[in-house]
Amino acid sequence: MAVPARKTSKTRKRNRRGHIKLTVPGLAPCPQCGELRKSHMVCPSCGYYDGKQVVENN
């Protein structure tokens, strides 16, 4: 089996993992109530999507 000839330094390890990170979800304000919601999803607070009420919220 192959074995590394030298210890991988912290810098090389971090450079290799530089692209592995969390992404921020795309949030947009709801045009009806102004609350933040995910883009292209029904607003969880008011139940509107594309100017129409889709879900009943009590």
Swiss-Prot record:
It holds the Pfam family Ribosomal_L32p. GO terms for cellular component: large ribosomal subunit. It comes from the Bacteria. Keywords: Ribonucleoprotein, Ribosomal protein. The keyword 4Fe-4S does not apply. One of its GO terms (biological process) is translation. One of its GO terms (molecular function) is structural constituent of ribosome. InterPro entries: Ribosomal_bL32 (IPR002677), Ribosomal_bL32_bact (IPR044957), Ribosomal_zn-bd (IPR011332). Belongs to the bacterial ribosomal protein bL32 family. NCBIfam families: rpmF_bact. This is Large ribosomal subunit protein bL32. It comes from Limosilactobacillus fermentum (strain NBRC 3956 / LMG 18251). The lineage of its organism: Bacteria, Bacillati, Bacillota, Bacilli, Lactobacillales.
